[in-house]
Every structure is written in C-alpha cells, then in structure tokens.
Regions:
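Acidic, surface-exposed loops and disordered segments
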Residues: 1-230
Length: 230
C-alpha cells in the first residue's frame, strides 16, 4: 500500500486538510447560556432528567471556586422515578400551595458540612449558578428554592427513611434546585431607572422590576448597564 494512502483517501472524501485536523465545534457562548438560564416555574411533565445528567450537573462543583477551598457543600439527587417518597415531599415544598407551579421530575438538595454563614452563602451562590448553567448547556432549566427552613428540607429529603436520615446526619440543609425541561418561554426585557415610576420618596415604585407573564411569555426586567455601572 502506498505511503499516506489513508490520509490521501481521507482528504479525497472529506476535503484537503481534513486529515489530522478534526474540526471542533464550539459550544454556546457564556452570554448565550446566561440568557437561556432563566428561572423556570412550569416544567414539562413528560421530560425526565437522567441520573447521568444530574451527576454531570453536580460534578461542576469539583471545578468551581470555594472560599478558602473548604469545599463544604454536599448534594443529594432526588428523582421521581428512584425516590418517590422524598420526591413527593420536595414536590410539595416546590408547589408551596401555588397550583400553577408545575414541578419537574428531579431535584438537587444542597447541604453544608458547616453552619450557614457569609462564605458558605458565597459558595452556595457560585454552586447554584454553575449547576444551572451546566443544566442549560444540557438542555434543561432550573429554579433555586430557598424559602424553606432547614428542618423542612431535611424532613423532605429523609422522607421518614432512617437510612436517608443517617446519610445527612450532621449536615446543614441549605436550598434545593429544581431541574427539568421548561414548559414556558422567557424573555429578558431591558429597562432603565430613568423610565421607572417613582413613589412618594422619589425611589422607583415597588414592582418596577417584578417579572410577569403576558400572552404565554414570562418577562424578566433587567436593568441596563448604565444603571448598574458606577
């Protein structure tokens, strides 16, 4: 066989320069992921998130920054299919009496090995945003839920199972993350403080930056750069 036969044949089929130079496709830019990363309150009921994808989402925490590199955060994955009891209790916390909320089929519960404090909260914010961006990259959306007490969250995750309760003994529940396929459209709406209605004290009126739904679209007002840059 002639020298370089395979390389020459590859070039004939795929074009000159193709051999030895596989073309890499770039993924979505950070700006694209940020725009797609919208809080979702209505999820598709027919879409499940695989355990592999959930592990991939949690895995970003092995690469992100951590205050003093303490790496105190721990994560519990709960899927409707695998953990129906815990899922049911977390679903109830998610809906919170608001029937228009449609829960996803999976949650990620975040715990800490240390009591909540300033640096734990900084780590938590980095973690939640990073996991949400990874979820978006995989085709999902998220919602961060932090209104519940630590006791409520621990109770929901344990779901009356002594083994599950033992697995989180000594940990401090923080928040949980809903992960699924969005069943709503979201749109960022640039707004300026110069256009804001003012209250009696001269400050922007309450509700100026509140998100809202209109004609099936979820609108999220965001201040323009000129308003946040000092």
């Amino acid at each position: 066989m002639a020298d370089n036969y395979l390389e020459k044949r590859y070039e004939e089929v795929f074009g000159a320069g193709a051999a030895g130079h596989s073309k890499k496709r770039g993924g979505p830019s950070l700006n694209t992921l940020l725009v797609r990363n919208r809080s979702t309150r209505r999820f598709r009921t027919d879409a499940e998130v695989s355990i592999e994808h959930l592990r991939t989402i949690v895995e970003v925490n092995t690469r992100i920054a951590s205050a003093m590199n303490r790496q105190t955060l721990r994560f519990g994955i709960v899927r409707k299919e695998d953990d129906p009891a815990a899922y049911g209790r977390l679903r109830d916390l998610y809906v919170h009496g608001q029937d228009w909320r449609i829960p996803p089929s999976s949650f990620i519960v975040v715990f800490s090995t240390l009591p909540e404090g300033r640096f734990i909260d900084i780590d938590l914010g980095i973690s939640l945003q990073s996991m949400s961006l990874k979820a978006v990259e995989l085709g999902y959306n998220c919602l961060m839920i932090g209104r519940n007490t630590a006791e409520e969250l621990a109770e929901a995750y344990s779901a009356g199972d002594p083994a599950r309760a033992a697995s989180i003994a000594g940990l401090h529940p923080l928040v949980f993350l809903a992960v699924g396929k969005a069943d709503q459209s979201a749109f960022l709406k640039p707004v300026s403080l110069a256009d804001a209605p003012l209250d009696e004290s001269g400050h922007p009126a309450p509700g100026f930056l509140a998100y809202y739904d209109k004609d099936g679209v979820h609108y999220v007002p965001k201040l323009v750069l000129e308003d946040i840059l000092l």
